[in-house]
UniProtKB/Swiss-Prot annotation:
It is found in: Cell membrane. Its main location: membrane. InterPro entries: T3SS_PrgH/EprH, T3SS_PrgH/EprH-like. The chain crosses the membrane at residues 142-162. GO terms for cellular component: plasma membrane. It comes from the Bacteria. This is Protein PrgH. Keywords: Cell membrane, Membrane, Transmembrane, Transmembrane helix, Virulence. The gene is prgH. NCBIfam families: PrgH, PRK15327.1. It comes from Salmonella typhimurium (strain LT2 / SGSC1412 / ATCC 700720). Required for invasion of epithelial cells. It is a single-pass membrane protein.
Length: 392
């Protein structure tokens, strides 16, 4: 078994997985940033219970009569490391892999290569031995492959399934985004849609223009954190009008985190689980939605600490269900900009449902009167009228 400890990948992504044995010998699968699941085993075992298993959209099935081990391949966002997780019964094993080097997972032999580089066979003796070892098991390999894909409900031959799979469509969309694709995540959804997760409004607009001008004919939708929060907030306000929550975080779009108030939450554990499933249904690209309880004291404390750090004058007003910080005074343009930047940053973390900010500007009644010289200077208000700022 391959046990390389090499962790630095110098070849640019994206990457391709090539099968070196089994009935799908020679088939290749695209690897996107994030997780890709490979289900390996006998075709009839999948339907032994009388119904099809629930397999994630970002996964592939590889028919193998003996020695099948499910595994995941994880590609870092910066593509500096590729990790293979063997999902054995009772435990899992993880290891980093090298490019263009045969890797054995159970009885399956695979190879990972950059998409931009051709396949270069290595260790021919190992490949030949493995091929002979598996030859009797896959004499009718084409039939086994077609049966496996039919059982999964694809309704077509294996090659067409690969070409039309959500993973392949995601790879096409990833390619359409070109050199800017690092700013986005392409997520296959359970509703047969592809979702492009953008980081901000500018990237959202850019990606939508690319889809509109390109020749991509599949169903795709560009999303971002702010728009998704607004969309889901409308649903929550309709079906959970009394729910005390902050916002949803999409640091990992496949596993969003929903922040609820610890002090104002009255839902039981079972009710929270039901809510999590409903939120997951609203986000077809999400594998799960984690609900986290946050302290109201922490939310208000971070707001107040931030105002003090920015040296902004404010007053605090506590009221039922929230806190309002009023930023007030004769603020100049720099202070106003600093206040707005802080408020925007706070809302991106906590939302604006519990802590709110208001700005009350006051005119500087000394503006344009005269000049003050030194700490003990004075201001000439009018002929015969002098103003000495305190302290004297």
């Amino acid at each position: 078994m391959e046990t390389s400890k090499e962790k630095t990948i110098t070849s640019p992504g994206p990457y391709i997985v090539r099968l070196l044995n089994s009935s799908l010998n020679g088939c290749e699968f695209p690897l996107l940033t994030g997780r890709t699941l490979f289900v390996v085993g006998q075709s009839d075992a999948l339907t032994a219970s009388g119904q099809l298993p629930d397999i994630p959209a970002d996964s592939f099935f590889i028919p193998l009569d003996h020695g099948g081990v499910n595994f995941e391949i994880q590609v870092d966002t910066d593509a500096t490391e590729i990790i293979l997780h063997e999902l054995k019964e009772g435990n899992s094993e993880s290891r980093s892999v090298q490019l263009n080097t045969p890797i054995q997972v159970g009885e399956l032999l695979i190879l990972i290569r950059p998409e931009s580089e051709p396949w270069v066979p290595e260790q021919p003796e190992k490949l030949e031995t493995s091929a002979k070892k598996n030859e009797p098991r896959f004499k009718n390999g084409i039939v086994a492959a077609l049966a496996g894909f039919f059982i999964l409900g694809i309704g077509t031959v294996g090659t067409l399934w690969i070409l039309n799979s959500p993973q392949r469509q995601a790879a096409e969309l990833d390619s359409l985004l070109g050199q800017e694709k690092e700013r986005f995540q392409v997520l296959p959804g359970r509703d047969k849609m592809l979702y492009v997760a953008a980081q901000n409004e500018r990237d959202t607009l850019w990606a939508r223009q690319v889809l509109a001008r390109g020749d991509y004919d599949k169903n795709a939708r560009v999303i971002n954190e702010n728009e998704e929060n607004k969309r889901i907030s409308i649903w929550l306000d309709t079906y959970y009008p009394q729910l005390a929550y902050y916002r949803i975080h999409f640091d990992e779009p496949r596993k969003p985190v929903f922040w609820l108030s610890r002090q104002r939450n009255t839902m039981s554990k079972k009710e929270l689980e039901v809510l999590s499933q409903k939120l997951r249904a609203l986000m077809p690209y999400a594998d799960s939605v984690n609900i986290t309880l946050m302290d109201d004291v922490t939310a208000a404390g971070q707001a107040e600490a931030g105002l003090k750090q920015q040296a902004l004058p404010y007053s605090r007003r506590n009221h039922k269900g929230g806190v309002t910080f009023v930023i007030q005074g004769a603020l100049d343009d720099v202070e106003i900009l600093r206040a707005r930047q802080f408020v925007d940053s706070y809302y991106r973390t906590w939302g604006g449902r519990y802590v709110q900010f208001a700005i009350e500007l006051k005119d500087d009644w000394l503006k344009g009167r005269s000049f003050q010289y030194g700490a003990e200077g004075y201001i000439k208000m009018s002929p015969g009228h002098w103003y000495f700022p305190s302290p004297l």
